[in-house]
Amino acid sequence: MTKKVYVKTFGCQMNEYDSDKMVDVLGAAEGLVKTDTPEDADVILFNTCSVREKAQEKVFSDLGRVRELKEANPNLIIGVGGCVASQEGASIVARAPYVDLVFGPQTLHRLPQMIDKRRESGRAQVDISFPEIEKFDHLPPARVDGPSAFVSIMEGCSKYCSYCVVPYTRGEEVSRPLDDVLTEIAGLADQGVREVTLLGQNVNAYRAGLTLGSTEIADFAQLIEYVADIPGIERIRYTTSHPKEFTQRLIDTYAKVPKLVSHLHLPVQHGSDRILMAMKRGYTVLEYKSVIRKLRAIRPDLSLSTDLIVGFPGETEEDFDKMMTLVHEMKYDTSFSFIYSPRPGTPAANLHDDTPREVKLRRLQHLQATIEENVQRISDSMVGKIERILVERPARKDPNELAGRTENNRVVNFPAPVASHARLIGQMVDVKIVKAYPHSLRGELVLVHDEAPATTH
């Protein structure tokens, strides 16, 4: 009987990518197939996030829920990976003795060996080392089911923002060799992928030799240009970038590479220079706005999303007002906004924080309401327009409809005959937007672009 693996993913798109690789590794080595129900699984993995305390505690809550499955089936393997694993290490096993594996983001390729050792020794296996970029040399070829795919181009972060745990859990910035990245993307294109999202904690820090042993270095702008030349790739996205390293070369790429979408996620974190300095972000509000101004001079239709932290230690009402001023000025398409969560081991965790939680909550609610108003305003402005979308899949709520995304990352659902679904998935189509909902759009099919073959499923 075929054995199965269940993976629950917390956090960022890097973790989503890593979770897919866990399935690929175990599929290639052990013949496991993915299941969406933990009750059916022979291996249960939690790919964790430690950016906020709430996400970290959710992991232990979920571990408690699968404990009964372990008691009913002692052969069940339970593993904890990701950033919580890197941070907590063997203490996870001390807190939850039924956990069999603890592994970091850089050691997921060792999962088959860790499972074997666990079965042989009867002891929990912990491997949270940082073996540079080794994991990419041991991963099987990427497998995809759809026209969009994530591709990790680098690991780690070297910025050491005062509030952030990522450099401690994922290590310093290490870029994948250029030819490795391009080979993976070319392989994905051969499988019908039309859109790639280049992933990293700080993608615009990418630096890699043009060829093995080469002294000539390719930066992130060059990488994008090379990706755009790969046959079959029609759209390029990336996340996440850092304002400090948003170079003029990268800005110029928006003029040179039409396949680079007019959507950018550029975390600002705050709108007060005083708070940005305390966060050790390395730029001012004016410098951030300068980047956006230059980009919008090239792409007036640029859609912008960001990350914002409310209630950082010492944040005053004046600081928050400056954040709101920036939000209004930038006209963000969306944002990921949260109340500051102190992370153990980071410098900011030692800062005095005397702002009452109810004040932080009020500020967050005001911020999010303002962003939502802007999101709806942008969506409403799209009604009546023709948008080119990449058809990705059947719509989740209605199997008679298809779904895809616009350049500015809006999900569009539109009716299409079921008999046409296989042909349309993976195609670029023009859709007229007829209605705007809070988190999606509804459209009508206008034109199918036949410049590339449909994906095979």
From Swiss-Prot:
Residues 143-377 form the Radical SAM core domain. [4Fe-4S] cluster 2 binds at C157, C161, C164. It catalyses: N(6)-dimethylallyladenosine(37) in tRNA + (sulfur carrier)-SH + AH2 + 2 S-adenosyl-L-methionine = 2-methylsulfanyl-N(6)-dimethylallyladenosine(37) in tRNA + (sulfur carrier)-H + 5'-deoxyadenosine + L-methionine + A + S-adenosyl-L-homocysteine + 2 H(+). It is found in: Cytoplasm. Residues 380-447 form the TRAM domain. Pfam families: Radical_SAM, TRAM, UPF0004. Its cofactor is [4Fe-4S] cluster. It comes from the Bacteria. PROSITE patterns: MTTASE_N, MTTASE_RADICAL, RADICAL_SAM, TRAM. Its EC number is 2.8.4.3. Residues 3-120 form the MTTase N-terminal domain. Keywords: 4Fe-4S, Cytoplasm, Iron, Iron-sulfur, Metal-binding, S-adenosyl-L-methionine, Transferase, tRNA processing. GO terms for molecular function: 4 iron, 4 sulfur cluster binding; metal ion binding; N6-isopentenyladenosine methylthiotransferase activity. Monomer. Belongs to the methylthiotransferase family. MiaB subfamily. This is tRNA-2-methylthio-N(6)-dimethylallyladenosine synthase. It comes from Paraburkholderia xenovorans (strain LB400). The gene is miaB.
